[in-house]
Amino acid sequence: MLVTTNDGTFTLKSQKYNECYHSSEGAVTETLYKHIYPAFSVVNKNEIKILDICFGLGYNTFLSILNKPKNSKLKIYSPELDKNLIKSLKTFNYPKEFNKIQHIIDEISQNFYFKDENIEIEIFIGDARKYIKTLDSIDIVYQDAFSPKVNTELWTIEYFKDIDKLNPKIITTYSVASPVRYALYSLGYNLYTHQYDNIRKGTLASKEILPFPSANFEDKLKRIKPFYYSDKSS
């Protein structure tokens, strides 16, 4: 089902998970302020490797291309369960600024892969948990799966241990759920948030000291009995 968000851009509602791919704030707005801007403010190098969990409608990937540091090359790796969704993206009603990368959208829709001199995108159709074990290293992780309530397997301590093996400089996510933050905290990540007008808080995680407001998770640990999600099948 097509849904119009508050910034005028479109998203879809998943029948499987009964959730929209983006918040009501806006597909572009949420993507930029919770993922793209924070990530690129701390990662600026000749070649940037991004893990986009999961591909969905591709806003994270496409807006990364449109907003990447000027002289950087991007390698983007992204799992996605819904093969038919990817095939349909060539006709999705994206914002006008996406017109300049329509050739990329078309290529991905057909071949699940794109490469030119500055951009490489690989979409893996299947289980994200298996896919991340095939990767070597990543600079940025967009942790943007459906919510822990309905897509718990992509928010477990076992899952985040595999993410941690990739040594990301920053993990970005819309989630502020205590079990998610506790999993990252338990793995040695510093937890931050971002504060923009009219944008709900998310979580930024890094083992480095970053110039973002602290999430003050240690204070919360004094008031709660912490736990993290666990997937015994991982």
Q: Language-model segments: what does each one mean?
A:
Residues 151-209:
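C-terminal substrate-binding/active-site "lid" region of AdoMet-derived donor-dependent transferases
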Residues 31-35, 127, 159:
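Well-ordered alpha-helical segments embedded in enzymatic catalytic cores
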Residues 1-3, 7, 114-117, 203-234:
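SAM/dcSAM-binding transferase cores
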Residues 139-154:
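A short SAM/SAH-binding and catalytic strip from SAM-dependent methyltransferases
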Residues 41, 46-136, 142, 196-200, ...:
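The AdoMet/dcAdoMet-binding core of the Class I SAM-like
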